[in-house]
């Protein structure tokens, strides 16, 4: 019972610390990471909007291949 209480208190304390730290650092990040879709388009060859694509290959820069013919959206 004591161990359970200690674990609960520890989790609550760590959660509170995370929330306080996250609130204090909001908007202070200098070098933000690129979004994953931007990284994908910069690191691999991908097809632009309107190009033919394969729904199984995920080869569109936008990430979406739609339609019956398969065009990048």
UniProtKB/Swiss-Prot annotation:
Keywords: Amidation, Calcium channel impairing toxin, Disulfide bond, Ion channel impairing toxin, Knottin, Neurotoxin, Pharmaceutical, Presynaptic neurotoxin, Secreted, Signal, Toxin, Voltage-gated calcium channel impairing toxin. The modification Cysteine amide is found at residue 72. Expressed by the venom duct. GO terms for molecular function: calcium channel regulator activity; ion channel inhibitor activity; toxin activity. SUPFAM superfamilies: omega toxin-like. Residues 1-22 form the signal peptide. Belongs to the conotoxin O1 superfamily. It is found in: Secreted. Residues 23-45 form a propeptide. This is Omega-conotoxin CVID.
């Amino acid at each position: 019972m004591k161990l359970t209480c200690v674990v609960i208190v520890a989790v609550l304390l760590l959660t509170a610390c995370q929330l306080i730290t996250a609130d204090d650092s909001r908007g202070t990040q200098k070098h933000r990471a690129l979004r994953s879709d931007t990284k994908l388009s910069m690191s691999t060859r991908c097809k632009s909007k309107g190009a033919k694509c394969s729904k199984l290959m995920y080869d569109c820069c936008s990430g979406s291949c739609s339609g019956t013919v398969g065009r990048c959206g």
